[in-house]
Swiss-Prot record:
DNA-dependent RNA polymerase catalyzes the transcription of DNA into RNA using the four ribonucleoside triphosphates as substrates. Component of RNA polymerase IV which mediates 24-nt short-interfering RNAs (siRNA) accumulation. Implicated in siRNA-directed heterochromatin formation through the action of DCL3 and AGO4, and subsequent DNA methylation-dependent silencing of targeted sequences. Essential component of a self-reinforcing loop coupling de novo DNA methylation to siRNA production. This is DNA-directed RNA polymerase IV subunit 7. One of its GO terms (cellular component) is RNA polymerase IV complex. Belongs to the eukaryotic RPB7/RPC8 RNA polymerase subunit family. One of its GO terms (biological process) is DNA-templated transcription initiation.
Length: 174
């Protein structure tokens, strides 16, 4: 789910950038975009997608050690985070006999266990897949509608993993 958030952030402008004749607001926006792009995700907000509106620029404070100027800013941004029970679409990118891995938006690790695919059987081979009695296939590249069972934040990688299920109405490959 996409979430609109209001974020406080500290933007640091090197002293040499103040001499280039750039407008201050432009220099702050450029530094904000650079810092925002380096920050992948947070546990509370999910994946940081994009800043949208710069709402406020606070008073700058000079750092005595470096001479840089630090400005507190407040801006609106868009984040993406999956929640338990949410219905989401994803694309299969790995197939194993125990289940499949999907991608959806910035989520790269979504696991759909074979135990959460009722009626589907694993078909081994060069290009393995899962198939049900109606010949519906879950294979690499297949688009799947699933329900999120749970998510987990991975601090070291600064990303999320999710568990999925297609046990329910209107869920599965489409």
């Amino acid at each position: 789910m996409f979430i609109k958030v209001k974020l406080p952030w500290d933007v640091t402008i090197p002293a040499e950038d103040m001499d280039t004749g750039l407008m201050l607001q432009r220099a702050i926006v450029i530094r904000l975009l650079e810092a925002f792009s380096k920050e992948k995700a947070t546990k509370d907000l999910g994946y940081l997608i994009t800043p949208t509106i710069l709402e406020n620029i606070g008073e700058g404070k000079i750092k005595e050690q470096t001479g840089e100027i630090q400005f507190p800013v407040v801006f609106n941004g868009i984040c993406f985070k999956m929640f338990k029970g949410e219905i989401v679409h994803g694309v299969v990118h790995k197939v194993h006999k125990t289940g499949v891995f999907l991608k959806s938006g910035p989520y790269e690790i979504i696991y759909l266990s074979h135990m959460k695919m009722p009626g589907y059987e694993f078909i081994p081979g060069e290009n393995p897949f899962f198939m049900n009695q109606y010949m519906s296939r879950i294979q690499i590249g297949a688009r799947v509608r699933f329900v999120v069972l749970d998510t987990e934040w991975r601090e070291a990688e600064k990303d999320f993993m999710a568990l999925a299920s297609i046990d329910g109405d209107n869920l599965g490959p489409f």
